[in-house]
Amino acid sequence: MKIIHANRFGEGKNLVIIHGFLGMGDNWKSLGKKWADNGFCVHLLDMRNHGRSFHSDEFNYQVMTQDVINYLIDQKIESCCIIGHSMGGKVAMQLA
């Protein structure tokens, strides 16, 4: 099982941020650091075929949703808030 790349900042309640198409977690770094300063453990994900995550010929919402689930399991995250932008928003809705 491949795990997507993520940067993590802060401590507290988990906040997972999923970027939009052609983006990466770093696009959310400024806001992520502010939320981290306000009591969140912020996870800035790089989805497959984006940023520093692995590349794959398989690319659809079902596998991206499973990638996030695999990340949450790997990080032992049982509860979190999720923010998704554009493509990431659709992944977030499928996680709900």
What are these regions (language model features)?
Residues 35, 95-96:
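Aromatic pocket-lining residues of Rossmann-like dinucleotide-binding sites
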Residues 30, 94-95:
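Active-site signature of alpha/beta-hydrolase-fold catalytic machinery across serine-
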Residues 7-54:
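Conserved HGGG/HGGXW glycine-rich cap/lid loop of the alpha/beta-hydrolase fold
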Residues 43, 47-83:
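Active-site loop/oxyanion-hole signature of alpha/beta-hydrolase fold enzymes
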Residues 1-3:
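N-terminal cap/lid segment of alpha/beta-hydrolase-fold proteins
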Residues 84-88, 92:
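Gly/Ala-rich beta-loop-alpha elbow adjacent to hydrolase catalytic centers
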